[in-house]
């Protein structure tokens, strides 16, 4: 499933080697490889800048920003040479410029190793050499494990990198090794640093307790199959703040400017040492004055904190190893000492779309008549027929894959698609019609597999920030959203009062939730900064039904 979060602009790219263990095994774990040969063998890959890459630059005494500044200078010089604005425009000069750019982009101390066999892995962890550099295993990311890819680093840098990655945590505190490595792996996420907030508070998660009906799966000692028990009005505890925190609107605005994004932004996915999750803009200062009548909150360590001294509120589910530090001040001091900063990986997209494709999992649980099926596939059939029938608007819409806007031509990737945007008569050209016909054939094949267009979109999900504020100020937790409801500024503005929620991978029909959308002055006021976010109530089991999702994303099919 796609994220309804957008990769932020201008994350710089670096290059690293990516080798298979079989390649090293054949070289007796001591490989000499020229960069030209590595490129020809697709053994040089591009990675987005990350905290780990910044750590490696820092350990080498290199300024990461200085690298990009020099690369930009060299690219400008190359452009001037190509345009005839430089006296020395020889091919040798251009070649030397590109060679320097490639050298600056490469991080030779960072190597991705693809494990071809268990025996190879057991040998690789003892270390190997490539071009005179000895590499040792550093960590595996959650995404890397799925593709048998492990991060190795230059042996001489590993102790310093591990010290930074551990970030002064209490090493005596027990930690599950797999989880600890997963948390350390956050340092390899593509991210862009942002300025330090003017104060941070870490608060306890907001738990909401109620009774509900649910299915309980139990493992049986004498059977390989689980036992399903129907529980009626059983006790339920929901973490309504799982994976998200709050940021002052001013902080989100400042970070948006630093990221060179177009505002307003309804939320950001952030990283720091052992810290991950979404933060959403919410005026907790206003809540303190109008609702709590207090400026004091108790943080997760039990310390009193003044809410007006903070721009960022983290929850314990975001700061994974909070209990390995004495206080928030201790945590932030270690971050500063080890070179950690807050950084942003993705943002909530400022623009949503009114239609998206389903997948077969979302359709399978429904029992539909022939008429139901005809109604469901009608928009998709209309798209295909319209394009083949020469409708310029539908052709343009299909080629872009998203809703049409006036400035669409500037963003179209294919020449013939741009041509249609400029002159619709291009559709009469045999070549263009042939190309579109090939694409439509593929589109029809996808539709047969359940990729049906309906009115709906992917939405970033949040718990109720009003309830979180009630919790952190020690008030009775009620929230603003009753059971079975949610709030969506985007869909409310379009007159939608009910949605169906799905989340992939979807295993059964119980994961489809019908949700009524609340729209009242109180919700509109308190949630006014959270554009394009689906805010869920904490008084039902929607998050559990959506395969135990935390505050990330869900597909919503709009119903009116």
Where in the sequence are the language-model features?
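Conserved small-residue
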Residues: 1-542
């Amino acid at each position: 499933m796609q994220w309804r979060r957008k990769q932020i602009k201008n994350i710089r790219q670096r290059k690293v080697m990516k080798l298979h263990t079989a390649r090293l095994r054949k070289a007796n774990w001591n490989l000499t490889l020229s960069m030209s040969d590595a490129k020809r063998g697709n053994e040089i890959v591009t990675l987005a800048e990350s905290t780990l890459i910044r750590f490696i630059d820092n350990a080498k005494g290199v300024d990461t920003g200085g690298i990009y500044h020099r690369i930009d200078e060299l690219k400008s010089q190359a452009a001037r040479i190509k345009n005839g604005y430089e006296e020395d425009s020889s091919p040798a000069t251009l070649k030397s410029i590109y060679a320097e750019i490639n050298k600056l982009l490469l991080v030779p101390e960072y190597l991705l190793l693809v494990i071809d066999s268990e025996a190879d892995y057991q040998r690789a962890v003892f270390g190997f050499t490539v071009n005179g550099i000895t590499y040792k295993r550093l960590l595996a990311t959650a995404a890397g494990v799925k593709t048998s890819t492990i991060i190795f680093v230059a042996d001489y840098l590993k102790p310093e990198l591990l010290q930074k990655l551990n970030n002064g945590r209490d090493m005596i505190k027990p930690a599950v090794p797999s989880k600890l490595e997963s948390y350390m792996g956050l340092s390899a996420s593509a991210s862009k640093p942002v300025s330090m907030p003017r104060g941070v508070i870490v608060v306890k998660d907001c738990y909401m307790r109620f009774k509900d009906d649910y299915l309980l799966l139990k493992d049986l000692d004498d059977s390989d199959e689980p036992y399903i028990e129907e529980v009626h009005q059983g006790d339920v505890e929901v973490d309504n703040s799982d994976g998200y925190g709050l940021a002052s609107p001013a902080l989100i605005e400042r970070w948006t400017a630093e990221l060179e994004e177009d505002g307003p932004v309804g939320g950001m996915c952030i990283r720091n040492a052992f810290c991950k999750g979404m933060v959403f803009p919410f005026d907790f200062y206003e809540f303190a004055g109008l609702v709590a009548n207090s400026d004091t909150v108790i943080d997760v360590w039990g310390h009193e904190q003044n809410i007006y001294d903070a721009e960022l509120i983290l929850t314990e589910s975001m700061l994974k190893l909070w209990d390995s530090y004495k206080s928030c001040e201790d945590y932030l001091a270690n971050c500063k000492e080890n070179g950690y900063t807050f950084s942003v990986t993705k943002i909530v997209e400022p623009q949503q779309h009114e239609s998206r494709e389903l997948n077969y999992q979302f359709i399978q649980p429904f029992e539909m008549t022939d008429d139901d099926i005809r109604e469901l596939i009608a928009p998709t059939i209309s798209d295909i027929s319209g394009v083949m029938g020469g409708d310029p608007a539908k052709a343009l819409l299909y080629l872009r894959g998203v809703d049409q806007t006036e400035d669409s031509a500037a963003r179209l990737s294919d020449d013939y698609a741009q041509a249609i945007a400029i002159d619709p008569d291009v559709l009469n050209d045999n070549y263009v019609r042939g190309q579109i016909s090939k694409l439509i054939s593929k589109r029809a094949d996808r539709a047969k597999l359940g990729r049906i267009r309906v009115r709906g979109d992917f939405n970033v999900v949040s718990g109720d920030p009003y309830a979180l504020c009630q919790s952190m100020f020690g008030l009775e937790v009620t929230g603003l959203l009753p059971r079975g409801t949610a709030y969506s500024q985007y869909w409310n503005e379009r007159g939608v009062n009910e949605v169906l929620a799905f989340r992939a991978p979807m295993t059964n029909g119980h994961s489809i939730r019908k949700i009524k959308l609340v729209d009242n002055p109180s919700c509109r006021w308190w949630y006014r900064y959270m554009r394009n976010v689906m805010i869920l109530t904490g008084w039902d089991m929607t998050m559990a039904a959506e395969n135990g999702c935390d505050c990330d994303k869900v597909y919503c099919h709009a119903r009116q």
